[in-house]
Every structure is written in structure tokens, then in C-alpha cells.
Amino acid sequence: ERYTQTAELINSERSNEMTDSTVIMILSESFSDPTRVSGISFSEDPMPAIRSVKNTTTSGLMVSPAYGGGTANIEFQALTGLSMALYDPTLSSAYQQLVPNMDNPFSFNQLWDSKQGDGSVAFHPYNRNMYFRDRNYKSFGFNRFYALDGEDQMTDLAKIDAAWYASDESTYCNVLDYLSETDDTEQFVQVVTMQNHMPYDSWYQNNQFIDGDTSVDLTDDERV
């Protein structure tokens, strides 16, 4: 009730709603701002493109509740607003243990579904059944899910140099192609990338930050 009253007060002078536009939520695998790590300095900005976007629009920070694995748990928390800290520690994977057993799982994209109809789409350049994403996205109300396999497949996915997974750029191109081909200007698009998924090694040529590698003394097990 307290939050409802606060929301009503904030929205009382607003004429537009978020669901009147297309919102793209990107969870970029392993992405963080390295300039925020203490004890590390850079001769140039490692993320100039993102920084330029942040400097010209509304932006902020999101604190990740985990690192080193469990990508789908971060995704679950971002989509539902539910913290894994609220559950028993034996719950190691919400997508595999919790969501399949929920009668009506709530997720953020449903705000568009309820107002615009079938208004949410998901993209993930990997196998659709990983972490039960295919069935969970359906439970969340996504009407289409583009992945490596299945009925709706992503196309022209490319890798960078020796990297194992599809590049973020080619993933985003799939999203842009989809948006250019649809007349729907009021929808929610969920994007989960794969480019920087583990394992971590010297995949990229001409990496100007290689001299700052802090993993040279790690064992093979620690790298994984």
C-alpha cells in the first residue's frame, strides 16, 4: 500500500506511460564497468560507447547480487523483481526449481502484455532450453523467443576472433532487424547476450587492454 501511494504521487503529473513505448532490457553476459574497480587504472575508457549513451540520457547503476556463475538467477531477479535472498539457500536455480512450479509467475514484461496484448519478445543466442528458458518465457507471457534453435531462430550470428559465442553486435543486429520489420512500437524486448560467457582466455586479437591482464597468475581451475 505504501509503494502504491508513492507511485500514484509520482505518476500524478505524468501524461505518458512506460508501456506506450518500446523498452529493450539487455543483460550483457559478464559485463561490468571496470573503472569502478579499486586499484585498477586505464589509459583509455574501456566502454566509451556505453558511456556516451549514459551521458546523454537517463542512466544509473545496477548492483549484481552475484558473480562467477548463475546468469539465469540474475535474469530471474531482473524480470520479476524478486530477490534470491528471500528464498531458502537450497534454491540454486530459480529458473529450474521455482518458476516451473509457479502457477502464475509475475514478470515485468507482463505490463506490456496486459495493455498492448502480445507485447513482449525475447532474444538469447544460445540453446532455448538452457535453464528451461523456453518454457519459463512462455509462462512469463513472452509471445516469441528467438534463439539458436527452434521455430524462431536468430540469424547471421558472428563470433569475434577466437571467441566461442555469438558477439553482442550480431545479437543486437538481430534485435534491430526484428524491430525494423514490425509495426509494433509499444513492446518489451528481453535480450540476454553470450559473447563474454566463460571460459575466459585471450580470445581477441588487437586487445589494447591485454597488458593489464590480472589473471596471468591464475591456475586453470581458477580461470574456469
Residue ranges and their predicted role:
Residues 4-20, 25-28, 33-224:
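Solvent-exposed soluble domains appended to multi-pass membrane proteins
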